[in-house]
């Protein structure tokens, strides 16, 4: 605690036995020795003494981490225990040290030969001494804040007492202004000469754990760090590093029954509280870890222990690569753990599931695999449908077979009323289903391609997928032709004559012309009770959920026109980086032209408007449950159906949540985030809002289903705020260090933060000393001026009030006459110019005070002027000020020989001014 303090704790180098300090008893968890490394063996000549030394004091084995400690009596609470929360959480004191073994002579003498008289004495315990010594403090104390005494084996009670003593010493030194015998505090800004007189010269070798560290301590910490992680990776070779970090968090930060955290051993504590371990060494240190490292190394900024401001030291972390700007990256364990348990909580028990199709492969039940979906290649082809006036089951089967021959990964559309679906293998892409229902004379169940969960509807009983694959049901469809598309994470713009967009994966769009109806349509993503609907069976839409891509659309040219069609005709589109342009041909009401040409934002020109056009529109979808609106328009008096669809996609957080999309034509807008309301079943033309349910994120962005959870949304916002604040703080720190480097260093090479701060402190000290010198000089000059003024005033007061009588001459000259007179006299004798400067203020006062209106008035004012302005107490300060002005404007003090020339120039300028006026 004084100038230089070294604490020595002799112990066994090879055993993990109990280490004992000579003075205080210590808990085991404060041991920071590198016991994982074997110590160097003693010389061969001293092997016997070393074995005797080890056998003299057998040590008990170290208690395991899970062994229970025996109950003991609590210690007495002292006055300083308010500084910690739990002063009694410590291990029992250990047994005393065997001093007989310590004092045993272990020095061995070696001779070089029989004839040589040279010999060498080596202490066998010399290597042990270096392992047991730990540097506690070097130099003098600077701050009285709490000190953990890292490296010293102290109990909580001793740490509290030492910190109280340090605080009391600081109080005595700085508040009571008296020296204390315990420890002495110094501050770099004191400017005292004896700051560094007792400090040992130490080279700055690294930053992070200590400001100034000896190279031996750095090497020792590095060896402990490497040994610890080698052992950890040997135990967890087959596990990912994210689960390893999670296990460490659970091991280090969980609380026991009494609520107090378990002390962390020093071998593991160095991982938690140092920046040096992760960022202060080069990449070659991680060469042994690269084979077991599937992801980036955990960022030390995310370790909660480093959040304490007292534990952070300036390091090189701001210069390391930072992945915080990639907001879409989630914690690594979510990729491997959360996707395994999502569907278990969503799916009902197997008893409630209907029987699957025997022809379906087993992989069809797994909707979303645990890993990211690979891209599926879809051919650039065209699927045409028959143009017959009516659609029967046979034609529906033909459409299904046509779609099946294109790609096995696309779920075919089912148009049959009661025919079982034709299942195809789909091991990769999740399939979303839509069911179009319209009133008819009889109820008809519509089978879906993915029977998972039964719907609670009383009359219509199509099987229902999970929460994020609910069938989208339409209570009724108007005469217009709505085409609903499911997009992933982009904005599709619409056009009356052409619609273009690009995808990374296929997207199946099936358009139908249902029977005319006047009831509004509603779309829900959760099963809702439907009223009994009658009518012929309507086909349902089946489409594939693609990956999030950026889609480019055509410009808004004119509102799409939707003309009611007399007969239902299905149109199936298979898209992969293709352009879709509906065109009108003779004899065929609908055609779809597909090209694989490069897409332009302007779109592709097409022919005139066909009887039925395809309208594709979506809104910008946010990360958390974005909403896509599809608005259709009709040129007739029929109502405009409004449908809303949740899109389980993930885009950047900068997009506006719930953006509305409205087409030209003045159709009513539906808010993107509307509450659940009842849908009117009457035939009135009114848009019906849809019910919404949580939709999951895409599989490649951790299908955790937490996008609509308010807690997760709030946590995400808080995380973004913290990231922004942390980046701003680091940027300010970096800018501050750059400014300091520009101020204190002339060279452009990068210096460490510790050196920068040290030089900055020295620079500030120098500036403060210079400022103090300047302030002292200014104060001295002000005092000298005041002293001179006081002396002059005292001398003037000693002079008599009256002097030599002067004949009063009448001053009736004007200013120009006065200047002319001064000029003429000065040219004769330059000394008159000095006299003119003295009498000029007197002449000005005479002109302003003496009146010549009458003789009596002139006599009275002249006498008054004499009394006020011509007395010696008034003339003396006036003459003094004139002489001061003469001294400051001329060189009478520095070079009196130039005064005649300056007087001539002054009167010449004065004559010019009077002539100009």
UniProtKB/Swiss-Prot annotation:
Region called Mediates heterotypic interactions between MLXIP and MLX and is required for cytoplasmic localization, residue ranges: 830-879
Xref: SUPFAM superfamilies: HLH, helix-loop-helix DNA-binding domain
Domain of life: Eukaryota
Occurrences of domain bHLH (ranges): 717-767
Region (Leucine-zipper): 767-788
GO MF annotation, one: DNA binding
Function: Binds DNA as a heterodimer with MLX/TCFL4 and activates transcription. Binds to the canonical E box sequence 5'-CACGTG-3'. Plays a role in transcriptional activation of glycolytic target genes. Involved in glucose-responsive gene regulation. Regulates transcription in response to changes in cellular carbohydrate abundance such as occurs during fasting to feeding metabolic transition.
Protein name: MLX-interacting protein
Organism: Mus musculus (Mouse)
UniProt gene name: Mlxip
